[in-house]
Amino acid sequence: VLQGYSGMVPTNIHDYDKNAEVIEQGEWCSFQRPTMLKTTSSTFEKYAKKFYQCQKEVYGDVSNYYATDPFHEGGITGGMNASDISEKVLTEMITADKDAVWIIQSWQGNPTTALLNGLDRVEKGTDHALILDLYAEKDPHYDEGRPGAEAYGDEEEFDKTPWLFCMLNNFGGRLGLHGHLDNLANNIPKVFNETKYIA
């Protein structure tokens, strides 16, 4: 999986490009977040094209899978609409690689319904996306109908977008490698028997 481009640039971008329309992102866990280009600007297209060209020069033509999360664990949209953002990110990705598949992490509030709706604006957009339900063994997002679940799309299974059942056994300072065995024993068979869009 290669890196996808969603507009991240260095915080000092204006030292190199005075015309870049950006949104400062502040901090995440005391680390400075990268600045984001506005996807509505012509600068975004220019930088996306350059990013994919340079990445191909470095790695070669090795993959059609690209991971990027524009506002993972927060971030500031600066008034931009999430549907517009995802439409533009996917459009530029497909422009660079007609067979591109955008790998999207389902974590916390991501992907939002608006982000998923933006995929639908691109021809066969959901065919160019694959969602990783990162903590599916404990907190599945594909099953939005369960009690207490947040909505991840207007329709079932991330708006009928292909997705993967993932297990995240070690994160956030948890040093032991273990799983939720009762959930695994029950949920994995349920997923394969009751879902339609698992990849």
Model-derived features with residue positions:
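Catalytic-core regions of glycoside hydrolase
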Residues: 1-199
